[in-house]
Amino acid sequence: MKVLKKMLEWFNRPNSMYIDDGWVEQANKEMQNESEEWMKSMISAEKEKKLERSALKLMRDIYGDKS
C-alpha cells in the first residue's frame, strides 16, 4: 500500500514539481520542420516529373512518327 500512496503523491504534485517537458515541444518543432521540408521536396519532385513528362510528350509530338 505504501507504493500506491507514493504513486498517488507523485501524480498529485503541483505543476512546478513535474519533470520539464520542454524537450517535447522542441521535438515537435523539429518534426514539424522536417515534415515541411519533406513536403516541399515531394512537391518539387512532382513538379519535376510533370515537366519531364510534358517535355517528353512535346518531343514525341515534334519528332514522333506521323504516319
Curated annotation (Swiss-Prot):
Organism superkingdom:
Viruses
Name of this protein: Uncharacterized 8.1 kDa protein in modB-mrh intergenic region
The record lists the organism as Enterobacteria phage T4
